[in-house]
Swiss-Prot record:
Keywords: Host cytoplasm, Virion. Its main location: virion. GO terms for biological process: protein folding. InterPro entries: Cyclophilin-like_dom_sf, Cyclophilin-type_PPIase, Cyclophilin-type_PPIase_dom. GO terms for cellular component: host cell cytoplasm; virion component. Homotrimer. Residues 18-205 form the PPIase cyclophilin-type domain. It comes from the Viruses. This is Structural PPIase-like protein L605. It is found in: Virion; Host cytoplasm. Gene3D superfamilies: Cyclophilin-like (2.40.100.10). Belongs to the cyclophilin-type PPIase family. GO terms for molecular function: cyclosporin A binding; peptidyl-prolyl cis-trans isomerase activity.
Length: 234
């Protein structure tokens, strides 16, 4: 399943997602994030769908009698935070190699152009989620699955004010700020210290009441009915 940049899915104006943060195979906490669709619609939808993890990339064509295709699941689950900076930010989102070398999108891995919404949010506080851009060979700027989360409020001693030049804030952590504090304390630089490797565990989107409502099955003709009709128990 893939999406098109011309026909965006709609997860609502301010969808909410969660991410469990893992260290040494143990969950150290959960981040709850509210997203701002009006800041960057295509970027927000890409982020939401990657937390849901229900899109796939065909890795190779199958062989043999049944010719099964091999698929790679596009998801943030399992992604490492491959770039960290104390009192500044943590970076993740490489859904293929988990080292910052191969990000992607749910739009058939097509890059997302910088078509922003009507609102702009500066990098001024802790817990802001923003998308990290890259520049192609022609000098054009695009976005993909790479994101960062700020670890502190803006200060003269950090570089958050520089992020507004090309990164775009698409959300904010509203639950789990203590988890960010814990991460920040563990990446404080000391001589010869090796930073721990954090990764994303289980993640997903919170459904609103309309999305969470159970719907009746639909048959091939489009009529709503139960496909397996229950039988009476005597």
């Amino acid at each position: 399943m893939n999406y098109s940049l011309e026909d965006l899915p709609n997860s609502g104006k301010n969808p909410r997602v969660y991410m469990d943060i893992v260290l040494n195979n143990e969950i150290i906490g959960r981040l709850q994030i509210k997203l701002f669709r009006d800041a960057f619609p295509a970027g927000v939808e890409n982020f939401v769908q990657l937390t849901n993890g229900k899109t796939y990339r065909v890795n190779s064509n199958g062989t043999g009698k049944y010719k099964y295709n091999r698929h790679i699941n596009r998801t943030y689950e399992g992604c490492k935070f491959h770039n960290v900076l104390h009192n500044n930010y943590i970076v993740s989102g490489d859904i293929y190699n988990s080292n910052g070398s191969s990000a992607g999108t749910v739009y058939c891995d097509e890059p997302i152009p910088p078509v922003f919404g009507d609102y702009f949010y500066p990098h001024e506080s802790k817990g802001l989620l923003s998308l990290v851009p890259y520049t192609d060979e022609s000098g054009n700027r695009y976005y993909d699955s790479t994101f960062m989360i700020t670890l502190d409020d803006i200060r003269p001693s950090n570089v958050l004010d520089e992020l507004d030049r090309d990164q775009v804030v698409i959300g904010q952590v509203y639950g789990g700020l203590d988890v960010l504090d814990k991460i920040n304390s563990m990446i404080k630089p000391y001589a010869g210290r090796k930073y721990p490797t954090f990764s994303i565990g289980k993640c997903g989107a919170y459904l609103d009441s309309s999305q969470a409502q159970r719907k009746r099955p639909v048959n091939v003709n489009g009529t709503k009915r139960f496909l397996n009709k229950p039988t009476r128990v005597n």
